[in-house]
Amino acid sequence: MKKTVVINVVGLTPSLIGECTPFLKEWSQAAQRAAIHPVLPAVTCSAQATYFTGKWPDTHGIVGNGWYFRDVCEIKFWHQSNKLVEAPKIWDIARQQDPTFTCANMFWWFNMYSTVDFSVTPRPQYLADGRKMPDCYTHPAGLRDHLQAKFGTFPLFDFWGPRTTIRSTQWIANASMEVDRLHNPTLTLIYLPHLDYNLQRLGPKDPKIGTDLGEIDAVCKELIAFYEGRGAQVIMLSEYGITDVNQPVALNRVLRQNGYLSVREERGTELLDPGASEAFAVVDHQLAHIYVKNLDRVAEVQQLIAGVPGVEKVLAGKERDAIHLSHPRAGEIIALADARSWFCYYYWLDDERAPDFARIVEIHKKPGYDPVEMIANPRIKFLVPKVALKVLKKKMGFRMLMDIIPLDASLIRGSHGRVPESKEEYPLLMTKNAALLPQTQIQPTEVFDVIMKHLQ
């Protein structure tokens, strides 16, 4: 099979390629480009699983970045086991065709306990005293020590949170090139997250985005020069486009105010209690799964959600077939936001009763995606010395809570998850092998076919 690298530049759309991305502009002019009709939800886990299986979410089962695990009555986000994906993966199929085929997965999701030959993925150490230490997980296990000895510890806090920078993306790029030098895999999948941050914080129209575009352009230039120099075919693609928003919608507050959602009180704060709730929403950017305990009440909950400002479409039962989300993991009801809105997870009615994890970066405890984790509370006076003191306490071994995340969802200016109004905001795929991409628009399931054609 032919050596191929797939570079996933998160959030890259045709509208962002231009003066701020001189290399990508020049490279794309020599390449064939197709718009990818977004999968729903247009989020990381669902898009990537669709790309590397060639199947829709109702087949591969990845209905979002998280969902309600009905057997344990818990909402879980960002799980990593590849066994959650319920369809054959491209590397397994390619290996059946060519036993010498090898694959490196560099930070695409569902990258633990996988059948790829080489993998690297973020995996912090969670210590008993509450500390979270930057680290990564690799296969083979010794690869972790090699990469972190050469490039330093994976910069977790530059990968997600208020201080995200190009450092995490550059680390992934460096690690990818090193894995290629060491093992020369046939197929390499690379995830570059840098654009995901300020496009959500500021929105795609903010002039400050130009700096981010220049930074990712430089990383792409380095990667493409490296891989083309090693005879690899390069595919550039993205998962979704991020569009301007100005209205957060708290579906769980609506459900609570109407008697469907239950909470548990702990030390004066409130925890969402999904197992005790008649209905609740698991929100994921611009799409929400609403889980309804009693199927006889689906119609009334659907009617309630349909009337919420910012909700564009509500689908239940077989109506979900149209967007390929009829799967046991999906909610009984699917809600889609309108173009200017997105769904926040908030369920408390008084900020004083918000749980302690609401004000920190805590991707696993929150019952929904929270982009506000990328913003430090602008109302905190003397933020820098306050953070420095907390870090000092952490280094001295004291417990501390980095509670600097605001409870103001209106701060978010960009989102994704639905199909954008303009194709200029669709995700894209680019390759210099024009004969392998005859269309100008493809379905997300066809990304699998494009990659396979390059390999063959």
Q: What residues fall within each predicted segment?
A:
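Short, structured active-site-proximal loop/turn typified by the sulfatase FGly-forming signature C/S-X-P-X-R
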Residues: 15-59, 104
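A short acidic (Asp/Glu
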Residues: 16-19, 115-117, 200-202, 245-249
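Beta-strand elements within well-structured catalytic alpha/beta cores of enzymes
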Residues: 2-15, 27, 51, 94, ...
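Secreted, luminal/periplasmic, and some membrane-associated catalytic domains
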Residues: 19, 37, 42-43, 66-83, ...
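Short, solvent-exposed loop/turn segments at secondary-structure junctions
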Residues: 11-14, 41-42, 57, 108-113, ...
